[in-house]
Regions:
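Active-site loop-to-helix "anion-binding N-cap" substructures in soluble metabolic enzymes
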Residues: 2-257
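Glycine-rich adenosine-cofactor-binding loop
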Residues: 261-273
Length: 273
């Protein structure tokens, strides 16, 4: 099997979703600050918007902070929204766009792409999500559902924009369910996405853009998934709230000494997905 391109630095994002309290977030930041993390992996954590500044102020400098969503326009009379200008003002570097838990509230492919483009134009990098429901997986029509999501991104991004984009493939049926795409299923879909990206954005973009897997990724399945040539990292949900997140970050390293230290906490226990 062809090895994963070394030009695509391994990437692990942690989506904390709507979880935590001030004390729990502080514990999680403390845990990350005390872990031995390989420098071979780019790491981003995405706390709830209300905790962004606190996490940014306390988190180690080699772990970036991202938002879980971003508004598609600038500042103004948009109650409840968070603009890219606000995020960059507080030093946030990344934003997730197009997560299925946002799309299920009615966001179209075009609206998601507009968010992504506006964020990139304002200086943010984005984790651009895509993924299919179980019905499409079972019907063998995964690409029919996912490719239009990719096309919407390709329609708005310039070639230069793609340097600030990672794609996160998250099969909807595997998010928060405990189900996980097999390494072969995930690799096949990632390969299909990369080949389609070459068609709509060019071969250079397809080769250089990182494609993450999300959907019940954890410390147990991460090593086998990460061995596949088109899987360039993970967007992690529930497991990012636990000490095993460090093992996921380190799953590419052969240095057995890189282990999370025992800091006496169990993450956020059973909350979250």
């Amino acid at each position: 099997m062809t090895a994963r391109s070394e030009a695509r630095k391994f990437f692990v994002g942690g989506n904390w979703k709507c979880n935590g309290s001030v004390s729990q977030v502080n514990e999680l930041v403390s845990m990350l600050n005390q872990c031995s993390l390989t420098s071979d992996t780019e790491v981003v954590v995405c706390p709830s918007q209300v905790y962004l500044q606190g996490v940014k102020d306390k988190l180690r400098s080699d772990v970036a902070v991202g938002a879980q969503d971003v508004w598609m326009k600038g500042n103004g009379a948009f109650t409840g929204e968070t603009s890219a200008d606000m995020l960059t003002d507080m030093g946030v570097q990344w934003a997730v766009v197009g997560h299925s838990e946002r799309r299920e509230k009615g966001e179209s492919n075009e609206e998601v792409a507009a968010k992504a483009k506006f964020a990139v134009d304002k200086g943010l990098s984005v984790m651009a999500c895509c993924g299919e429901p179980q019905a499409n997986r079972e019907a063998g029509t995964t690409n029919d559902f996912v490719f239009p999501q990719i096309k919407a991104y390709a329609d708005v991004f310039t070639k230069e924009d793609w340097a600030k984009v990672v794609i996160a493939y998250e099969p909807i049926w595997a998010i928060g369910t405990g189900l996980t795409a097999s390494p072969e299923q995930a690799q096949d879909t990632h390969k299909d996405i990369r080949q389609y990206l070459a068609q709509v954005a060019g071969a250079e973009v397809a080769e250089s853009t990182r494609i993450l897997y999300g959907g019940s990724a954890n410390a147990k399945n991460a090593p086998e998934l990460s061995a596949k040539p088109d899987i360039d990292g993970f967007l992690v949900g529930g497991a990012s709230l636990k000490p095993e997140f460090a093992d996921i970050i380190n799953c590419q390293t052969t240095l057995k000494s890189l282990k999370p230290v025992n800091v006496g906490i169990n993450g956020f226990g059973r909350i979250g997905r």
